[in-house]
Amino acid sequence: MSGTLGIAIQPLRVADSNAEAVRLTEYWSARCEGRAMPARRDLDVVEMRDWLGRLSLYEVLGDGDMWCRLRGSTMCTIPVPGHDSDGVLVSRTQPHSFAEMGLRHYAETHALAEPTCYRIELSFDGLTYRYDRLALPLASDGVLRPMVMTFIKCDVRRARAFWERYQEAGLALTS
């Protein structure tokens, strides 16, 4: 058994991702209303119901870290070590290489002030799973910090099995 998490990352045009990511990006673009990006208050959760379970919100802290403000209900069923449903620093997610990959993607999205999308493949102990992660920047509204909203498209059953195997190997807190 290898104790190393393999991470392969491929930049992806949103149009080459999946129909749900395309529709969410169109929704986000419509909320810009002439600005570089919308703020969280510009988004209506009722209009976003098709995506809610796979959305997460990350607050930009300004020190290179992000605070997981909200993790979608579907995403909460995937046992990523150290990545609770909300109220956790992304840097505390395990393994560290996985946290760093997420932080780079979120920081890039915030800095570019435009949607970014990646196809990510994780491998460990002969098991792999692939997912697309769309990240959309959200401006500060003067009260809330700027945020990055993510949408994940994956095989949830496979993702659960992957992270469960990773944790069973006892690597969740040592990688």
Regions found by a protein language model. Name each.
Residues 1-93, 97-175:
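Intrinsically disordered, low-complexity terminal regulatory regions
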